[in-house]
């Protein structure tokens, strides 16, 4: 099927399935987080605990023998022996990295180099290392060393007094990219061709020559790939065994080469690490055996002993070069998943996903069993990973979202510069592990699926079907209805995020003076005629006809502001700071002022003349004579007597969908294009022109009826910030809408039993009812 090649025989697959029968009604796709333990693996471990007396190894030599047996098993698993490597047990790979950071001897002028696409724990090493310079390397800068012949650089393999440490992951836990391990020897022999970007340089002088040591974070790699330490010999290897076996947790290891052991200088000592230590003087003597010097206190001996069942389980379920076969299996699944995802498209041809990887999925030596991606809408907008996590949870699919404790890979693949990172973490307040998934439409993380030896092809197919059913086959409001109806089934961390998934009211604008600039507001009260103060005033000419941008484009440069109880009008065209004000309240004086009549869309309207001061100001700014400002004085009803209107053309509210605006593809900033359509309400459904199918919708607590599409004229060709015309706006809409000049929808408010004065506010959720 596709490019999937089965690795296991039918009998082997049946045995594996029987061990993981508990997965019958769920799909587990987070093996990069941890793989799963087999049924008999934990049963055998429990039987051993019930059968044997396993006590503190400082008390019982039998326990010490068990622990040593596990050490030999670990060395055998990585194709090495005790003559080449020491095994130091730690709590996990992070603790192993810390051990190196704490004790590595940089000399007086050594450097610390780390790869950008690394686990957070590697970044944490920066706080402990005693190096005078700390550098960040990109993946490509590390790869530069792979083409360097031995002895080609200035740092070639003669001994130096200073020592530099280079840390990188054998496999990126974000993307699954595998670093070519041949680079290890090149760096050890020749140093680095490029030092990277200096992140913290206490000394500005030339770093000079140095011996180079490599610390390999193998936590992700070793879980599903064979690591041959006879072929590739890093100085330090960091491991977490739960990622390989699923059980037990709380035990990892630092493998230290004989070369690397010389550079780890122990300072602190705990129980079991010394031959003696005097309380009355500073004198002490560390144990001569390397691992005994570094394993402070009592080991987690029960967990260590239970690793034996892990090794046995792998050999029993995946016999014959277990890790080689697991590597082929997970890579085949990942390649199949990637190819199927790439084939998924919306009816308009837009891809469903954006994938994140460096080398594609053709070569197993470069790519592991991880697929990272983000889902996109038909308009190309990103779907937040929090939504994907919610949909997956309701389909009983366990996957991972976010940055996966690899913010450097996140930064690289999301193309986030320093300012964007500050906006996400400092200004917006995101923290690692939350569901803050989009910032101004850009993803702050991704969706990750990863595979283990017990993952089946149908598990991948279930993920793919979920994406088809939830994104290619239904509209967004149907999907969100599905989530909201089942929100209590979600984990608590996702329940709040799920309630925020609905599209929100993004922008709220009123146009106090008809055909003048918008006044954008965070919230607005609603009246019987629409938004408060929306189109209550209009400018008329000598003949009493309403002045619009069709006749005078400079109207868009008159910027209204509401300050206290005044409506201020500012002119943005000449850089002046002068303005004119009219009162917001209808005082007796205003009520007794001259009444005038005009027309809006062939309907007569009555208004109060706002006086000579504002009239003279308008004439001066617009360069026209005889202008007057009128304020609507009487109720006006739409045709059919259904709704009260202000001085709007046709309905109480005009709604525009940013997804539809985005589909026009104009080169100007999107916000400028949105402003051309002079809407009251801006939303973003992610699907262009979907709003034309709405019947009723709720915004916050307010119910609206759709009156129909807005038929456009050439006024939308005017840039509302400059007053310049660009006729391609109208022709583009006509082309996309098959000759129809429709863009945006008119809506009117339906009666509401709530007697409180309703209002709309940015952030209100949007619910499509029919």
Curated annotation (Swiss-Prot):
MOSC domain: residues covered: 611-769
Cofactor annotation: pyridoxal 5'-phosphate
Pfam family, one: MOSC_N
Reactions listed under catalytic activity: Mo-molybdopterin + L-cysteine + AH2 = thio-Mo-molybdopterin + L-alanine + A + H2O
UniProt modified residues of type N6-(pyridoxal phosphate)lysine: 243
Entries under SUPFAM superfamilies matching the protein: MOSC N-terminal domain-like, PK beta-barrel domain-like, PLP-dependent transferases
UniProt-listed HAMAP family: MOCOS
Name of protein: Molybdenum cofactor sulfurase
Species, as recorded: Drosophila grimshawi
């Amino acid at each position: 099927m596709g490019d999937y090649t089965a690795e296991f025989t039918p009998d082997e697959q049946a045995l594996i399935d029987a061990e993981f029968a508990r997965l019958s009604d769920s799909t587990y796709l987070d093996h990069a987080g941890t793989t799963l333990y087999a049924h008999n693996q934990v049963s055998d471990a429990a039987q051993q605990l019930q059968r044997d007396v396993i006590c503190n190894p400082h008390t019982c030599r039998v326990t010490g023998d068990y622990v040593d047996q596990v050490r030999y098993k670990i060395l055998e698993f990585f194709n090495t022996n005790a003559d080449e490597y020491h095994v130091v047990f730690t709590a996990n790979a992070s603790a192993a990295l810390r051990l190196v950071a704490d004790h590595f001897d940089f000399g007086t002028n050594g450097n610390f180099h780390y790869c950008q696409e690394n686990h957070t724990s590697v970044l944490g090493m920066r706080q402990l290392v005693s190096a005078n310079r700390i550098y960040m390397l990109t993946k490509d800068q590390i790869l530069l060393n792979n083409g360097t012949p031995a002895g080609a650089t200035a740092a070639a393999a003669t001994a130096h007094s200073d020592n530099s440490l280079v840390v990188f992951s054998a496999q990126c836990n974000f993307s699954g990219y595998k670093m070519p391990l041949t680079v290890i020897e090149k760096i050890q022999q020749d140093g680095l061709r490029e030092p990277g970007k200096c992140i913290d340089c206490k000394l500005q002088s030339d770093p000079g020559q140095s011996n180079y040591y490599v610390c390999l974070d193998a936590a992700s790699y070793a879980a599903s790939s064979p690591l041959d330490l006879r072929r590739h010999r890093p100085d330090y290897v960091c491991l977490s065994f739960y990622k390989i076996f699923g059980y037990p947790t709380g035990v990892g290891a630092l493998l230290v080469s004989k070369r690397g052991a010389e550079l780890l200088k122990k300072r602190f000592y705990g129980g079991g690490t010394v031959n003696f230590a005097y309380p009355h003087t500073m004198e002490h003597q560390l144990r001569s055996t390397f691992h005994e010097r570094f394993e402070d206190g009592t080991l987690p001996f029960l967990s260590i002993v239970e690793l034996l069942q892990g090794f046995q389980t792998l050999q029993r379920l995946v016999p014959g070069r277990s890790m080689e076969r697991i590597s082929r299996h997970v890579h085949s699944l990942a390649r199949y998943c990637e190819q199927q995802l790439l084939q998924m498209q919306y009816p308009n041809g837009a891809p469903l996903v954006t994938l994140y990887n460096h080398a594609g999925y053709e070569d197993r030596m470069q790519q592991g069993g991880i697929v990272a991606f983000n889902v996109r809408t038909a308009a190309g907008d990103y779907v937040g990973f929090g939504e994907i996590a919610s949909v997956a949870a309701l389909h009983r699919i366990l996957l991972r979202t976010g940055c996966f404790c690899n913010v450097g890979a996140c930064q690289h693949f999301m193309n986030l510069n320093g300012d964007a990172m500050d906006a996400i973490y400092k200004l917006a307040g995101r923290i690692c592990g939350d569901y803050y998934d989009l910032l101004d439409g850009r993803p702050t993380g991704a969706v990750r699926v990863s595979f283990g030896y017990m993952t089946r092809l149908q598990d991948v197919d279930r993920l793919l079907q979920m994406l088809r059913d939830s994104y290619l086959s239904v509209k967004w409001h149907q999907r969100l209805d599905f989530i909201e109806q089942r929100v209590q089934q979600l984990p608590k961390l996702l329940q709040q995020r799920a309630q925020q998934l609905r599209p929100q009211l993004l922008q709220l604008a009123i146009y106090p003076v008809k055909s003048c600039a918008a006044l954008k507001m965070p919230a607005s009260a609603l009246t019987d005629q629409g938004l408060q103060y929306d189109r209550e005033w209009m400018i008329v000419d000598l003949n009493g006809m309403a002045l619009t941008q069709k006749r005078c484009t400079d109207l868009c440069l008159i910027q209204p502001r509401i300050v206290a109880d005044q409506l201020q009008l500012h002119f943005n065209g000449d850089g002046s700071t002068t303005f004119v004000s009219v009162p917001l309240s209808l005082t007796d004086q205003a009520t007794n002022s001259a009444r005038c009549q005009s027309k809006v869309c062939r309907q007569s309207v009555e208004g109060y003349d706002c006086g000579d001061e504002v009239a003279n100001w308008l004439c001066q700014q617009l360069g026209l004579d005889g202008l007057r400002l009128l304020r609507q004085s009487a109720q006006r009803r739409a045709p059919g007597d259904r709704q009260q209107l202000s001085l709007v053309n046709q309905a109480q509210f005009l709604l525009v969908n940013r997804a539809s605006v985005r589909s026009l593809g104009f080169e100007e900033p999107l916000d400028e294009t949105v402003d051309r359509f002079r809407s009251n309400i801006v939303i973003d459904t992610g699907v262009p022109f979907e709003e034309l199918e709405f019947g009723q919708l709720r915004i916050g607590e307010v119910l609206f009826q759709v009156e129909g599409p807005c038929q456009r004229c050439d006024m939308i060709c005017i840039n509302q910030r400059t007053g310049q015309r660009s006729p391609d706006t109208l022709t583009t809409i006509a082309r996309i809408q098959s000759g129809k000049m429709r863009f945006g929808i008119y809506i009117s408010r339906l009666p509401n039993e709530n007697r409180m004065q309703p209002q709309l506010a940015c952030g209100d959720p949007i619910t499509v009812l029919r």
